[in-house]
């Protein structure tokens, strides 16, 4: 969601802050701003919309100063406009904030009674006034910030700057991530390491309840009680990646085309392609001894987990409980310390997923984090990190992270099957061999781009689309619908094909394209029956299948996308690509902001 950057430097910082904020655009935002200290006074520039608007403003009205804070805002309290954009000021205090102050209404009423006037609708301005009130009592800036922090409830990350002090930024974290970057005679704050990549790869991650006093040549970190604490300084892996589109129009397009490579990297971490066996993993539990596996995630990661459920139950006979993270911890389901739980998140910072992780931690369960950022909060709070080696994913709509999550889960399901005695050594080799073929098949699918683009052009003319699938293709149908609606804004729904007659069939007519995901498998004929029901009502069928399915289907289709004949275990990985490409090209034809669709954020760090 919101992105935070702070720099205590030795040259003009405003352009550097904007550059760092660009690296946080993937998180989603609707306004942006920068504040510096010019000649001892606070100065700021803010703009609604994209960073290019802020850049224009800074070109017209440059900001001097060697210290500054910047922010990209994703609206929670108050509409997206310049007035609500950060940084917010109050009597010599400048602040940027990510998260939600849950007791903001109570604090606002208290501050109004004390004579403080509010110029915005945000909860952030409450914090600025709280700090200013403590300064007015005679406290020094650091202590004023500390006292204000003790009044806050909720999930937040903050960066605070003070008029007249060009060698101080106070940062604080309680939920959303915040990192300190160590430079040579300069220091940095950022929502993640990617923002700080141009400046440093030496990072200290704040933990929940931490607040930091950041100066040019030092950082001191304290807990909420003011006790000094030590946090590990580490080299960030994220800084090794350049964030650019290459020769592609959008990050999403680039990331779709990176999938053969990153799937290969991810699989190679978990299986040995040469010997045909799963690689040993230092897991905190034994697959053979647990009675159940819990999985929780949000959005696309949840759908990856749902496919993982099929795999674990099929290949390892391991029962899986799965739910979206926002519901998981409210179900009051029985949890056992003898079982394990996997939590899936690209960023490793998803608030609901992190809350579910902590819920299972309290129950004594062993925790695995399937994440794309090894330094993330979820990774640090888990017993084992199960990395997806996708590299930074900038497009808000997940593509390569999704297929890498599937690659991890498929590999783990094979390992679990071996450990539980369900899979023989020969079967393991067959499955690992199948997994090793996934990158090659993914490359073949990408060569269908011209056909898929043509189909997407036709698809973009409709207002509603239905996706159908059975077995692992049911979650894929939901993923296809999610992709289409989140970036093209075309209404779409994904259903289990067998549920068609239980409601969705009422919507079928000549204005309803139906995308059917149906490789030629043991239930192919059942899906064909559902296609016949659609055809009988005038629905326009787009079939995604393989050569066997295309040869045997008896129903007339509007279009048929023929994929390679692939082994069952990698089918969801390979069939994910055409649904991503359909959504991408449909969005291009609709003229939407593909990489940063409206109202969405890449990293959802509030519940």
Curated annotation (Swiss-Prot):
UniProt-listed CDD domains: GFAT, SIS_GlmS_GlmD_1, SIS_GlmS_GlmD_2
GO molecular function, one term: carbohydrate derivative binding
Catalytic residues of the enzyme: 2, 602
Domain (SIS) ranges: 283-422, 455-597
Cysteine disulfide links: none
GO biological process, one term: fructose 6-phosphate metabolic process
Keywords of this entry: Aminotransferase, Cytoplasm, Glutamine amidotransferase, Repeat, Transferase
Glutamine amidotransferase type-2 domain boundaries: 2-217
Catalytic activity, as annotated: D-fructose 6-phosphate + L-glutamine = D-glucosamine 6-phosphate + L-glutamate
EC number(s) reported in the record: 2.6.1.16
Enzyme class: transferase
Predominant subcellular localization, coarse grouping: cytoplasm
Keyword Transferase: yes
Gene Ontology CC annotation, any one: cytosol
Pfam families: GATase_6 (PF13522), SIS (PF01380)
Record's subcellular location: Cytoplasm
Binding partners and assembly: Homodimer.
Function comment: Catalyzes the first step in hexosamine metabolism, converting fructose-6P into glucosamine-6P using glutamine as a nitrogen source.
PANTHER family in UniProt: GLUCOSAMINE--FRUCTOSE-6-PHOSPHATE AMINOTRANSFERASE, ISOMERIZING, GLUTAMINE--FRUCTOSE-6-PHOSPHATE TRANSAMINASE (ISOMERIZING)
Name by which UniProt lists this protein: Glutamine--fructose-6-phosphate aminotransferase [isomerizing]
Lineage: Bacteria, Pseudomonadati, Pseudomonadota, Alphaproteobacteria, Hyphomicrobiales
Gene: glmS
């Amino acid at each position: 969601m919101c992105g935070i950057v702070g720099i205590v430097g030795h040259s003009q910082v405003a352009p550097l802050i904007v550059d760092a904020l660009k690296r946080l655009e993937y998180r989603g935002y609707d306004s942006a701003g920068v504040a510096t200290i010019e000649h001892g006074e606070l100065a700021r520039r803010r703009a609604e919309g994209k960073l290019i608007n802020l850049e224009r403003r800074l070109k017209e009205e440059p900001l001097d100063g060697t210290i500054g804070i910047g922010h990209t805002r994703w609206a929670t309290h108050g509409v997206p406009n310049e007035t609500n954009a950060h940084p917010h000021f109050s009597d010599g205090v400048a602040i940027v904030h990510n998260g939600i102050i849950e007791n903001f209404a109570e604090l606002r009423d208290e501050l109004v009674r004390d004579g403080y006037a509010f110029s915005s609708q945000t909860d952030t301005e409450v914090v600025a006034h709280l700090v200013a009130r403590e300064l007015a009592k005679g406290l020094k800036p650091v202590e004023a910030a500390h006292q204000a922090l003790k009044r806050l409830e909720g999930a937040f990350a903050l960066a605070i700057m003070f008029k007249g002090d060009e060698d101080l930024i106070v940062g604080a974290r309680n939920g959303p991530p915040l990192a300190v970057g160590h430079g040579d005679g300069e220091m940095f704050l950022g929502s993640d390491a990617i923002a700080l990549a141009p400046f440093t790869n030496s990072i200290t991650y704040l933990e929940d309840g931490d607040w930091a006093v950041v100066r040019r040549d030092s950082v001191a970190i304290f807990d909420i009680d003011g006790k000094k604490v030590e946090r590990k300084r580490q080299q960030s892996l994220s800084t090794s990646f350049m964030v650019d589109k290459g020769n592609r129009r959008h990050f999403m397009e680039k990331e779709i085309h990176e999938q053969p490579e990153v799937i290969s990297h991810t699989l190679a971490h978990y299986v040995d392609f040469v010997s045909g066996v799963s690689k040993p993993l230092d897991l905190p539990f034994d697959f053979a001894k647990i009675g159940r596996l819990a999985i929780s995630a949000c959005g696309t990661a949840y759908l990856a987990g749902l496919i993982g459920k099929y795999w674990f139950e099929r290949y390892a006979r391991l029962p899986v409980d799965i739910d979206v993270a926002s519901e998981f911890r409210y179900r009051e389901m029985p949890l056992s310390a003898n079982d394990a739980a996997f939590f899936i998140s690209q960023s490793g910072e998803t608030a609901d997923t992190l809350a579910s992780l902590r819920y299972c931690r309290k129950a004594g369960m062993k925790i695995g984090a399937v994440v794309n950022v090894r330094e993330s909060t979820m990774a640090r709070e888990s017993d084992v990190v199960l990395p997806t080696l996708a590299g930074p994913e900038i497009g808000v709509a997940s593509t390569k992270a999704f297929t890498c999550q599937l690659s991890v889960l498929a590999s783990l399901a094979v390992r679990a099957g071996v450990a539980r005695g369900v899979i023989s050594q020969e079967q393991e080799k067959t499955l690992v061999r199948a997994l090793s073929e996934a990158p090659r098949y993914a490359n073949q699918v990408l060569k269908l781009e011209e056909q898929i683009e043509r189909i997407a052009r036709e698809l973009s003319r409709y207002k509603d689309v239905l996706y159908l699938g059975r077995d692992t293709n049911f979650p894929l149908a939901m993923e296809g619908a999610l992709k289409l609606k989140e970036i093209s804004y075309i209404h779409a729904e994904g259903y289990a094909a067998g549920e068609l007659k239980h409601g969705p069939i009422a919507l079928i007519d000549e204005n309803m394209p139906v995308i059917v995901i149906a490789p030629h498998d043991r239930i192919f004929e059942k899906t064909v029956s559902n296609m016949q029901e659609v055809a009988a009502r005038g629905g326009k069928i787009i079939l995604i299948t393989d050569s066997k399915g295309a040869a045997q289907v008896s129903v007339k289709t509007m279009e048929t996308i023929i994929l390679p004949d692939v082994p069952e275990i990698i089918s969801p990985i390979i069939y994910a690509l055409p649904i991503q490409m359909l959504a991408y090209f449909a969005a291009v034809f609709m003229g939407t902001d593909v990489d940063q669709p409206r109202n969405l954020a890449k990293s959802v760090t509030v519940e």
